[in-house]
A protein has these predicted regions:
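Conserved ATP-driven motor cores of ASCE-family P-loop NTPases powering translocation/secretion/packaging/pilus
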Residues: 441-543
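P-loop NTPase motor domains
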Residues: 4-8, 36-44, 156-449, 464, ...
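Conserved long hydrophobic alpha-helices within structured protein cores
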Residues: 131-137, 392-400, 493
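A short glycine-/small-residue-rich loop at the edge of a beta-strand within enzyme catalytic domains
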Residues: 125, 131, 392, 428, ...
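Accessory regions of macromolecular translocation/handling assemblies
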Residues: 1-188, 195-208, 508, 512-536, ...
Length: 602
């Protein structure tokens, strides 16, 4: 029985301990010290009134209060007095607790929202003291290039979403000012090809290696060969995926899943063969097209073997487990008629390569994409803003660029490139789909790579990247709105800015035999900037949002105040960069170097 009672008592004590669980004893003691005074008061008052004899408790309390001057301040150890003191302290604690639980929360002036415009003190922790080490956003707001500030809470990525309608100054107020900073390597999308003319000389004379990929005029472009950057089978798959995503097949079946997968198998097999087996000079799209042209299929003769079949047959004998052989055997499972449809779609998809100038452009490589993070380089990617026929070339280039730089940062430089690479992606919607871009933009930050996505409207991003558009936007810590009236963009911006609380006066007048007037004062909520106000925003103003900071309504950057403005063609027409002369001189240097090497070999 004793044992059972002990167990019951232990269980009761355990329940009490769990009920009064104290996570922080020190904090518990400090918070309850004030209540000891009430315990003391209750104790000595109980002792005082109980010193009187006769009458009931009310009489003794009355007499005790009237003789309060005789109160003794020495506490009593009488259990009854101690209990009264504890009861008084407990009652006060209960009242305070109850008040705290039921107290009303007032936020004066913030009843309907606390949104406000940012001030200079809000952006100050994010600005680098040295002007040249900043990303230029507005005339008063900048963002340090230092990805590891002293206080980590001020660390922000350098990805910027820039939105502005046609004529809002995306190039003048954002791209050019940031090129004038000259603190990084730059990869710039250049619609119409004017940026390289206006800024190229400034960059070249400041030690930049200028690269140009021109999809408008191939004769004014350096050569780009995607095959030069294939390092593994993984790269082959990425190249095939980018080609499929940014080109179109032929016929009503071209977009169906089966035919697309069949095309992927065929491209993968052929590119795999070229990568592993072809001589260095033949590793290009011309060889790929020649192989497709040689892939004759006869519907009435399943046993017919074309030259490509014989190539793969010989390769299989040499290496049955070869990557290209495995892909080709899967493709060959298709019957003659099906294989013919696949080949037709392949031919249509790669039809742009029938243009001799494009084949020549992609026959060898001069861009050296993998070296952009090694030294200061400016790559201008010139695309047409009216015709997207050759934009798939740009999409392939960007896809390879991001993957090459990330791999080099990890494999060679321990995770961070020695020179930060800023990608100023003007007319981003015209570049095409960059596979897995939503994942790339989330990971490039740590490798010293950043992307500025420049759009005319936010809906353009959703049209290309569908459900991944929000992920891409979420990985841009900065958003700059330069003006526009596209409904979706304006609505989302107004909602993001939030609401502020304003004062509202209502007046009323009643007309009858006797006139009466009324005045009513109240508070209400209003958008910090309504959709209507955003659409009619002053052309010289812009809105900048930085993660974790109040938004800024500021003047656009005044390009003429930058110290390097005098180096632009905008300032002096003599600063025009002669692209043809630059490319000709490079070719001469290249020819001399090749001649010297050949002579040494002889």
């Amino acid at each position: 029985k004793v044992s059972t009672m002990n167990k019951i008592l232990e269980a009761i004590l355990s329940d009490i301990k769990n009920l009064i669980k104290i996570d922080n004893p020190k904090k518990f003691i400090l918070s309850n010290i004030p209540y000891l005074s009430f315990l003391y008061i209750g104790n000595i008052f109980s002792k005082h009134i109980n010193s009187y004899v006769g009458g009931d408790i009310i009489d003794r309390i009355t007499v005790g209060i009237s003789d309060i001057g005789t109160l003794s301040y020495i506490p009593s150890l009488n259990p009854r007095d101690l209990l009264v003191g504890i009861s008084v302290a407990g009652l006060v604690k209960l009242i305070v607790y109850s008040k705290g639980k039921n107290k009303k929360k007032y936020r004066q002036g913030k009843e309907y929202g606390s949104a406000r415009w940012g001030e200079s003190k809000d952006i100050a922790p994010y600005i680098d003291p040295k002007f040249e080490n900043n990303v230029l956003i507005t005339n008063t707001e900048r963002l340090t290039m230092n990805s590891r500030p002293k206080n980590p809470k001020y660390a922000r990525n350098k990805n910027v979403l820039v939105i502005g309608g046609s004529g809002s100054g995306k190039t003048r107020f954002y791209v050019k000012p940031n090129l004038m900073q000259m603190h990084s390597s730059y990869v710039v999308t250049d619609p119409k090809g004017t940026l390289v003319l206006e800024c190229g000389k400034m960059l070249y004379e400041n030690g930049y290696d200028i690269k140009i990929l021109n999809t408008i005029n191939f004769k004014k472009s350096m050569k780009y060969n995607p095959f030069a950057y294939l390092r593994s089978e993984k790269d082959i798959l990425k190249l095939v995926q980018t080609i499929i995503a940014n080109t179109k097949g032929d016929g009503e079946k071209a977009g169906e899943d089966f035919w697309v997968k069949a095309e992927k198998l065929y491209y993968t097999a052929l590119i795999g063969y070229i990568y592993y087996e072809a001589p260095e000079k033949e590793k290009n799209f011309k060889t790929l097209l020649d192989m497709i042209d040689a892939s004759e299929v006869r519907e009435d003769d399943e046993t017919y073997m074309n030259p490509i079949d014989r190539l793969f047959e010989a390769l299989e004998k040499k290496d049955p487990s070869h990557f290209a052989v495995k892909q080709y055997k899967k493709y060959k499972l298709a019957a003659g008629k099906t294989a013919k449809s696949i080949l037709i779609s392949c031919g249509a998809r790669l039809a742009p390569f029938d243009i001799r100038e494009l084949r020549e452009l992609m026959s060898e490589d001069e861009l050296e994409l993998d070296k952009i993070g090694d030294r200061k380089t400016a790559l201008f990617v010139i695309i047409s803003d009216t015709d997207d026929t050759f934009n798939f070339v740009v999409s392939i280039m960007y896809s390879q660029l991001f993957n090459l730089l990330c791999d080099k940062a990890d494999d060679v430089y321990g995770g961070r490139l020695p020179v930060h690479v800023r990608c100023l992606l003007d007319e981003f919607a015209n570049i095409g789909l960059i596979p897995k871009f939503e994942k790339l933009i989330a990971t490039i930050r740590s490798r010293e790579i950043s992307a500025s996505i420049i759009l005319q409207a936010q809906s353009q991003l959703k049209a290309i990247y569908k459900d991944h558009a929000d992920t891409i936007v979420g990985n841009c810590d900065s958003t700059l709105f330069l003006g526009g009236k596209e409904k979706t963009t304006v609505k989302e911006l107004s909602e993001t800015l939030g609401k502020e609380t304003i004062d509202l006066y209502n007046t009323s007048e009643t007309r009858s035999n006797q006139k009466s007037f009324g005045l009513n004062y109240q508070k209400t909520g209003k958008e910090l900037m309504s959709q209507d106000e955003i659409t009619v925003m002053d052309g010289g103003k812009c809105i900048y949002q930085l993660r974790g900071v109040r938004p800024f309504l500021s003047d656009k950057f005044d390009i003429t105040k930058h110290k390097n403005y005098r180096l632009l063609e905008d300032y002096d027409k003599n600063n025009l960069f002669d692209v043809e002369e630059y490319l000709t001189n490079r070719d001469k240097v290249k020819l001399k170097s090749s001649y010297k090497i050949n002579r040494l070999n002889i």
